[in-house]
Amino acid sequence: MYNKTVSINLDSRCNASCDHCCFSSSPTSTTRMEKEYIRELVTEFAKNKTIQVISFTGGEVFLDYKFLKELMEIIKPYEKQITLISNGFWGLSKKKVQEYFHDMNSLNVIALTISYDEYHAPFVKSSSIKNILEHSRKYPDIDISLNMAVTKDKMSNHILEELGDSILGVKITKFPMISVGAAKTRIKQENIHKFYSLEDEDSLHCPGYDIVYHHDGEIYPCCSPAIFETKITLREEYNQSFERTVEKLNSNLLLFILRKEGFKWFLNILKENNKIEEFDIPYEFSSICGVCGSLFNSAEKINYFYPYMEKYYNENFKV
C-alpha cells in the first residue's frame, strides 16, 4: 500500500513569488536537495518494481530543464510513467513548447498539470498558457489539466475568458486556498472559502497518502500544502531506502490512527481537555488539511498525544 507512486519536489526556486504559494517560492529561493542525491533517488525509484508513477514538481521544475530532462531520461528505460507540474512560464516561446512536448511525449510523460490563476498572472502571461494548451492537442497521450487556486475576491473567471477556446477539452479544477506558506501573511482570512466546520464529522477524515521527497530534505506522507509545515516526517536517515519509507508510512501509529479513526480522534482529546484554542484549531476551514497543519505543526503538539496513542496501542494491539 502507498508504494505505487512517489513525488519529488526538486527545488524551491521559482520564476514567480505568488501571494498564495505554499512553499513561499521565489526567484531567490535556494532550498533544494543536492543534484547527485536526486539522481540517486530517481535511479532507485526507476528500478523499484512496485513504483508505477514518478512525479516532479517544485518550485518550478522547468527552470532547470536540462536537469529535469536528465532525470526523465534516467527513468525512460524502466518504462515508468511520469507526471509534471508547472506554472507554464515557458509557453511564451513556441520553440520551447514544441521542444518540451516532443521530449515529454518520447520520455513517457503521461500528465502535465498547469498551475495558473490570478495569483500566477502577474508573473506568467495568459498567452503562455494558451500556447501550451493549444499545442497539447497534438499529443493526446499527455493528459493536460489546469489547476486554479481561488479566493472569494479572486475567482479567476476572467483568466478563463482570456484563455478562450484553448481550454476546450481541458480538465479545469478550481480549489480553495489553504492558509499556509505565503498565504498565511498575504491572503486575508475573510477571502478564503470555508466550506467545512468541526461539526461536520464526515469532513474529518484524511483524503489520502502519497510519499513526497521534499526539497528541504524531509520525506512527507502526503502532498497537501499543509503537510510541509508539520513535523510528520518519514525521514530517519539520509540513505533511507524507499522500502523503508513505505514501511514507516504503514507502521507509524499516528498515521494509522488518522487512517482508522480520522481527525475526530485527536480533536475529541483536545475538546475533552479544553485545548482546541491552544492548538489554534480553526472551527471553519476550506480543507481538512488545514486542521492537520494546526494539529501537528510542532513536536510539542505531537508529543501531547503520545500518552493517548500509547493507550490506543495497548488497547488495540498489545497481546
Swiss-Prot record:
Keyword Ribonucleoprotein found: no
Residues in Radical SAM core domain copies: 1-214
Record keyword 4Fe-4S present: yes
Binding-site residues, [4Fe-4S] cluster: 14, 18, 21
Top-level division of the source organism's lineage: Bacteria
InterPro entries recorded: Aldolase_TIM (IPR013785), Pep_rSAM_mat_YydG (IPR023904), Radical_SAM_PqqE_MftC-like (IPR050377), rSAM (IPR007197)
Entries under Pfam families matching the protein: Fer4_12, Radical_SAM
Record note on cofactor: Binds 1 [4Fe-4S] cluster. The cluster is coordinated with 3 cysteines and an exchangeable S-adenosyl-L-methionine.
Stretches assigned to coiled coil: none
Key words, A-Z: 4Fe-4S, Iron, Iron-sulfur, Metal-binding, S-adenosyl-L-methionine
Gene Ontology molecular function, alphabetical: 4 iron, 4 sulfur cluster binding; catalytic activity; metal ion binding
Names of required cofactors: [4Fe-4S] cluster
Its job: Required for production of the modified peptide YydF. May activate a metalloenzyme (Potential).
Protein name: Putative peptide biosynthesis protein YydG
Record organism: Bacillus subtilis (strain 168)
Name of the gene this protein is made from: yydG
